[in-house]
Amino acid sequence: MPDRNAVVTQELPIAATQTGFFGLYPAGDFRLIDGKCTDCGTIPSARWYFEHETIAVPAGGLAMAGYARRIATFDDVRAWHAGRSDDARPEYPPLVWVAAPQLVRHARLRADGASLDLAGTVLPIERVAKIPLNRSYYDASSTRFFASRPLTARGCLNANGRFVVRTLWPEDFHLRDVPPFRALPADFAPALALRQLMREEPNGGARSSFAAFTLWQKTSTVTDWRGRAVLAFIVNGGQGDDDEAHAGHFAIVTGRIADDGAIGDWLVNNFYTLDAESEKGIIAAPVPLDNYLADLNSGQAYYRPSYLLVAVLSRERATALVQAALGRVYNQFYRHQLVYYHPTTNCTSISVDTLRALGFDVPARGPTSRLLAWVGFPYFAAKERSADKAKLAFDYLTVDQTRLMPAAAIETIFGGLLSLSSGTATTESADRSLGQMLAQDLDALAFLRIPQIPSSRAWGDAPAVNAREYRARMPRDRSKVQIVPVPVRPFPARLRDDDLQPSSPHPSERAALAWGIVLLVGIPGLIAKAWKYLRASR
């Protein structure tokens, strides 16, 4: 038993780059800085967002993801992919938002939540402060949840020798052994089968235990997945106290299964609006899975349950390709060649568009209703007394659902992966496409359900899969709608490159123009005809 009166005298905690990985890449290949660095290759527009945050950047001499100028983002990805050789050097992310410079592993939280037991000693802790805009936080129920399990903690030692904890991650959320096989219902399409898994527990598994299942496995696959590369897709569920978040959140995850089955080092490619401050402190970036889910302020697991669809691969080439492509997308995103617009350029669409640009066919599910969008445009404008809100509604109704709804995207991706596994999918003819790589290298598909971490926040649920479900979760009394107002974060003009290409007009611009013509020409014409008719009838 550790000496509960002892204090840490050895070099604990350790630097976040001293052990483990960031996705596929050894953490030791990176160095820790903040965004004010002047000797790193990360572009200035990216560094600006992290001037007061700890980030990891590739060490000198390592190839970093780049970008092309005067070209649309996904045209850039397609052109880069077409010219990329099979033996290309790894292209490291331009940055990883590690959030905290130090970590400890295999720790236990004391029942009073005041210290961590590790390596035979005791490390006094305190928790990072709650962000003022954050409406809930870690509480006594969180301590009870963490006190029963081994933990990885990210944070930093302060001047008083206390470890200021930013992240607590349960190490028993792992893939140490191949998960038990879970047969899919034979009479269900893959999309519906996955939806059933996500919804089979109350609240979408928010209050349930961590669970992992094998959904498909190649017969020749070995039963030891340790060290295997993975390409995963994460969907976070709907929040219980934010009526803008019933559809959840989507991201692509890359990495490898650690020798002890750990998954916390996987890299989550999180896209989030850059032009507003997040009430939870979220900044769009590649981020370790443990911090993405379990940061005390921004961790998605504090707000809702989460689900991971994991493709276990025989080779890492598909994973490396996707991560390198996402590095280019991040560069274009930070410099505002790719601008966040929630209906059409969001966490889901950016991820799905990247997969499609690399040659993985994610079939479209179609829009919610083009007819309703066009016919309802003047109604929305009159009801909301805002043409801008009518445009927003139009764009939500006309975008393909796999580019808008996280649950629709992961369901469709699951179906696509199963088709690749059976040889029935349509892929690009070139062997170098992502679809062909996955068809050749896919060894298994696993499903992970990660519960919500108890805190003062309301329980979340499985994500809404379409607009009808989303509307059903909204309060009928509009005065009870919960929305968190956040301040804007304007992009500095000094960082805006002069080669940026104009964004394509939103689809709603055509609707606004068409209805404007109707109002300016059509209605006056009808009035004139009616007047002539009345005069003639006298």
Name every feature range the model reports, one short phrase each.
Residues 1, 535-538:
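Gram-negative bacterial Sec-dependent N-terminal signal peptides
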Residues 2-9, 13, 295-388:
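Active-site nucleophile-His-acid catalytic modules used for acyl/amide transfer and hydrolysis
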Residues 5-213:
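Long, charge-dense tracts
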Residues 44, 247-250, 376:
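Residues that flank catalytic or metal-binding motifs in active/ligand-binding sites
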Residues 159-160, 165, 521-522, 530-533:
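Sequence termini and other peripheral, non-core segments
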Residues 189-193, 211-306, 425, 440, ...:
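Glycine-rich catalytic cores of cysteine/serine-nucleophile enzymes that process amide/ester linkages
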Residues 357, 361-363, 379-488:
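Solvent-exposed soluble domains appended to multi-pass membrane proteins
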Residues 375, 527-535:
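Short, aromatic- and cysteine-enriched interfacial helices/patches
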